[in-house]
Amino acid sequence: MSSSQDKANLPANNSRARAKKLVLELQDEICAGLETIDGEGKFLEESWERPEGGGGRSRVLKDGQIFEQGGVNFSEVHGNELPPSIISQRPEAKGHSWFATGTSMVLHPKSPYIPTVHLNYRYFEAGPVWWFGGGADLTPFYPYLSDTRHFHSCHKNACDTIDKDLHKVFKPWCDEYFFLKHRNETRGVGGIFYDYQDGSGLLYKGQNANGKASKIAKELGEYSLNWENLFSLAKACGQAFLPSYEPIIKKRKNQSFSTKERDFQLYRRGRYAEFNLVWDRGTIFGLQTNGRTESILMSLPPLARWEYGYKPEENSREALLTDLFTKPQDWFTDKSLEKRCLTHQALD
């Protein structure tokens, strides 16, 4: 992609204000919906300011009926010195003042049968450079195929409102991004992920030139999406979250669980912490730009555990997670998944 963009691909005149308004509204809508779903827990809000410019508001819910801990953050930060993580990706932004705004969410439910879930939608500008990024992904501990398919279906439908090719790239990109290289497994069952979307070039702008997402993007060819298309994409995907997650909670919240299942949940939460601290670019960006540490690390689970050399019992429900649900799958069309899940009571 060239470092200059034609006039047709410039952001809207009021791009920063509109992007900020969008992510603020998403934060409000999601928090209100989650409080209703939980029934007991309430979000406590803390506003913060960044000395170099900007600030945000962090909302955290603790010890609810459903959620052990959950956070939904908003930030709007700006400055003159770009962090190395941005310059390495887009060197043409160097020397320009920059602006970034976004909302991010991580929910850690009490029940091992309700998946952890993450969401993030963001916008960035620096001189001639601008882009949207975002996505949502699901991390179950005792997964069900129907829950996984529902989550993916809702986000595919949101992408399809803009262009039916988007999900073809954003789904495998999510599998690629939320991957623990040191464990050789995905963080969960994925969802969608996209970054550096400025409406030009190939849809895939990640780092794995030989991966599935890159291959599909090359087959589709260069895309011409404008600022409004990508703004609408962020809105549609953000609004798809509650319908994608609430039905899963309703189906699983009354399932009883044992100490064994709770211990396995905490063990797998350790993997979640490993990814966020080692691989997540959002965490790295926040720490490099002197963001609010408490907000940046809000994504970490309140409790987690590690166990040396743990191996699940063969053919167990726990083994199914690592054998099937922490590997990229074609959730919609692979009929063999149903047979494998049925024998482990993971199909309903």
Swiss-Prot record:
Renumbered residue ranges of the record's region Important for dimerization: 272-307
HAMAP family, alphabetized: Coprogen_oxidas
Family statement drawn from the similarity comment of this UniProt entry: Belongs to the aerobic coproporphyrinogen-III oxidase family.
Subunit structure: Homodimer.
Reactions catalysed according to its record: coproporphyrinogen III + O2 + 2 H(+) = protoporphyrinogen IX + 2 CO2 + 2 H2O
Binding site for substrate: 104, 120-122
Alphabetical list of InterPro entries matching this protein: Coprogen_oxidase_aer (IPR001260), Coprogen_oxidase_aer_sf (IPR036406), Coprogen_oxidase_CS (IPR018375)
UniProt site (Important for dimerization): 182
Positions of a divalent metal cation binding: 108, 118, 152, 182
Subcellular locations according to the entry: Cytoplasm
A single MF term (Gene Ontology): metal ion binding
Protein name: Oxygen-dependent coproporphyrinogen-III oxidase
GO cellular component, one term: cytoplasm
Cofactor: a divalent metal cation
EC number: 1.3.3.3
EC main group: oxidoreductase
Alphabetized NCBIfam families for the sequence: PRK05330.1 (NF003727)
BP-aspect Gene Ontology terms: chlorophyll biosynthetic process; protoporphyrinogen IX biosynthetic process
Function: Involved in the heme and chlorophyll biosynthesis. Catalyzes the aerobic oxidative decarboxylation of propionate groups of rings A and B of coproporphyrinogen-III to yield the vinyl groups in protoporphyrinogen-IX.
Keywords: Chlorophyll biosynthesis, Cytoplasm, Heme biosynthesis, Metal-binding, Oxidoreductase, Porphyrin biosynthesis
Pathway info: Porphyrin-containing compound metabolism; protoporphyrin-IX biosynthesis; protoporphyrinogen-IX from coproporphyrinogen-III (O2 route): step 1/1
Active site (UniProt): 118
Gene this chain is encoded by: hemF
